[in-house]
Each structure stands twice: as structure tokens, then as C-alpha cells.
């Protein structure tokens, strides 16, 4: 493609173009699950095995969509809509804020948002884990049928139930968010 790209750009990452004057993009999910093939990622983004670190400061949506492999995608910054939508395996870590519908239709895998999450995080979730380190906005886990959400400062929407975190839950939240176990005790487990 030629010209400028407006954000959010979707579940894509720039690779070196084979055509002068053009930019080339590939699906993030395809790159982490099937490798870069003959393509080279454009710095500062780095792929090491099945771990992708996205640090180019571009806001994306649907990061990790439909991931079905044991990949790890770390976005250093904010993301927009539907992070981890329809994931079955793998992990997406967002160090900043996440837009609406993070973890929507999650069917396995793990989505970790270290910042705030906008409304409808975990909507229609079937299985997997969603961890929100900041403040979740309204309708957390709306119509959730399975899986687990860890958050604080939120209330359960039926059919979900809010439970106190236990030893294993505290360790999981502490590990994923890089916080003390004492701080992790303030979280709730939504099942």
C-alpha cells in the first residue's frame, strides 16, 4: 500500500516491502502462528520464536484475533477494539489501555490488560482468562458463559458471579500484572 496509514490499523504489523514506494503489512496472528516466512519485521517490532513484541506506538484493534497457537503477543502501549477476539490459545499482553470489547468471544487463551479497559470487556466469553489491571468500565463480562475474569472495582453481571480470589488466583494476578500478592488480593474473580 502507498501513502499514510490512519490508526487504529487492525491486527496487522509492517514488514519490509518488496516494492519500492509501498508499505507491506501482514496479520499479527499469521506472523506469530506461522512465522515470518520470507518477510522481515520493520523495527522496533521484534519477533523471537513465537513471541512478538509490538512497540511502534501505533494503535491497533483486534490484536491476536482468532489466535489458535501458543504464541505470546506483547503490545507496549494502548490498543483499541476487540483485543483477543475469538482467541482459542496464546497470550496477548497490553501494557496500556484497551478499548471496548477486549476479550470478546474469548474461547481459550489469555488476555492481560495492565491498564484500564473500556466497556464490554469479556462480552460473550466462553473460556480462557481475562486479567484487567486498571479500571474496567461498564458491562464487564456481559453474557459471559465461561472462562474467568480477574478485575477490581467492578460488579458481576448475571449470569457471572464475583468471588474472592484465593491463593492460586492471587499468584496468577500477581504474576501477570507484575504486582505484589498483597495488591493482587484486592481483585475479584468473575466466573
Set out the residue ranges of the language-model regions.
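Extended, positively charged loop/linker patches that create polyanion-binding surfaces
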Residues: 79-80, 95-107, 113-119, 124, ...
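Extracellular beta-strand-rich solenoid/capping regions of secreted or surface-exposed proteins
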Residues: 65-67, 84
